[in-house]
Amino acid sequence: MSEGTIRAYHPPDLEACRALWTELTERHREIYGTPSIGGDDPGLYFDEHLARVGSERLWVAERAGQVVGLVGLIVDGQEAEMEPIVVASACRSEGIGQALLKRVVEEAKELGVRYLSVKPVARNLEAIAFYYDFGFRTLGEIEMFIDLRTPPSDIWKPGPELFGHSFKY
């Protein structure tokens, strides 16, 4: 990451992190074609995340005095999940995501974590490729669901084949 730092989250970062969370939600809305994802104020989900897991293992990427990235680590024994991870769209492809990932991996190793997971949404192909290139190449669990709306939503696209089964995403 050029001319920036990764540092611990501090309460004055709240608004910038809400904005990053909102930007990620807007990306999800775009790739799924569903404007209701995240509700009316998706930034509030960052507040809920903080209330649920705390800020002890939350870091921001800062450049020129501005928060441009965010990453968190949720530890459960020898397993941990990276949540959230987001880089401002204007700052992508500049090494910020790599720097955030390296910070989380370093922390996880220091804590004795054996397995680190990340759960990008299925249609975020750029994120999936990014994580794959970083080394996330093992599937630990797969989340499957049924659309119970009547009729089922038409937002689902034909998706990948996995273990001989075709999925939508």
Stretch-by-stretch model annotation:
Residues 21, 131, 136:
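Conserved active-site tyrosine of GNAT-family acetyltransferases
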Residues 60, 66-74, 81-86:
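Conserved beta-strand in the GNAT
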Residues 118-128, 144-150:
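Conserved beta-strand-loop-alpha-helix junction that forms the acyl-donor binding cleft
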Residues 1-15, 158-169:
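Conserved N-terminal entry element of GNAT/NAT acetyltransferase domains
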Residues 87, 93-106, 129, 133:
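Conserved acetyl-CoA-binding loop-helix of GNAT-fold acetyltransferases
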Residues 108-119:
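Conserved GNAT acetyl-CoA-binding A-motif
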Residues 4, 11, 22-48:
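Conserved GNAT-fold acetyl-CoA-binding loop/helix
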Residues 47-60, 81:
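A short helix-loop-beta-strand connector motif used in the catalytic cores of GNAT acetyltransferases and
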